[in-house]
Amino acid sequence: MKRFPNPYRLSCLAAFVLLFCGCSPALIPFDEKVPAQALSYIGAPPVFDARVRFREIFCELLDDNRQRLGLKIGCDDYLWRLNDEPQAAASQKSLPAHDPGLNILIVPGAFSDCFEDIGKPYQDAAERLRQMGYQINNVDVSGLSSSPKNAEIIAGAVGKQNLGPSQPLVLLGYSKGTTDILHFLVTYPELAHRVTAVLSVAGAVNGTPLTDRFSEAKYDNWFARLSPGKCRPNDGGVFDSLSRVEQFQWLSTHPLPEHVRYFSLATFARYEDIQLHQRITYKFLEKIHPLNDGQLLFLDQLIPGSALLGYVNADHWTVAVPVEEKFSDRDPVKRAENRKLRGLLFEALILFLAESLSSPL
């Protein structure tokens, strides 16, 4: 079968989704002046607020590198300040010291191996920190496989880590990578004891209503045809694992290990700041809630019992992967700015973890 170029496939996907999104207006207007929210099950461990300290770290990094990187964006323009976020103390702490002793495994999202050149989160930023001595590696999960299948792959990667005495092992999950990590922690409890912390970036913690719509209509095969032929062998379960119905039910019946420390960074953006190929799915999700990133609702991205680091003003791809550098309607200046901000964001996340994991709860 003839395969179209990637931009064409993505445009076809957007047009296809339009048929099922309709054009009715959102019931709730876009308003960032709301409190932080999480959709969770009764009895779930509460999310606690760590936004003030993370904002301090990111904003100081931004100010320190603004001139060197040629960035003009304000910190509050990049990190949303919802109306319940406490104000920082008058005397702020200094930036934490780097801790190259952290061992970090990055688990990418769905379709990551299908678009290998753009599917790995924070590639440039991770390389910079590797040069500082950090051990940062990617877990080669299967982009079209289920979370149980990828949990097995993560287990293999965790088991191979040569950790020093008391060396922290951090699992960083992006998008469905977070879902895969949570399944690993529950399914492989002995190996899970090697894990110190889990950091979720735009994580599909509860799944997404988008997948329920498409899976219910049995469009899985159609989506598979859109993806390139270089996807690795898989069990085809990616959509089931991203289903809000399936994942939320799983989460409510599978308590997460209590010895692991959890951190969540969420995303949402205005329609005009969403990449072209996600605007149709944004409009679909907008009917449920306008605070979404084009793939996930903002209230579906927080791990129960995690520390909430903040909300990034970015769409689902821009926050972690360089999709717009390959396929984008944005001008080159904006693309370059987003790439630089992504690097600073990754460093801020690692600095926050270094500080947090150096002290007990």
Q: Would you name each region that the model predicts?
A:
Residues 2-12:
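Bacterial N-terminal signal peptides that target proteins for export
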Residues 11-22:
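Bacterial N-terminal signal peptides
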Residues 23-117, 361:
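Flexible, membrane-associating and regulatory peripheral segments of lipid-active enzymes
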Residues 36, 257-361:
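C-terminal catalytic-base region of ester-bond hydrolases, centering on the histidine
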Residues 95-169:
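Active-site catalytic motif of lipid deacylating hydrolases and related acyltransferases
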Residues 107-110, 175, 203, 267:
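Glycine-rich His-Gly loop
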Residues 118, 208-214, 273-278:
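Short aromatic-enriched loop/helix-cap "lid" or pocket-rim segments at secondary-structure transitions
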Residues 152-252:
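Serine-dependent carboxylesterase/thioesterase catalytic core
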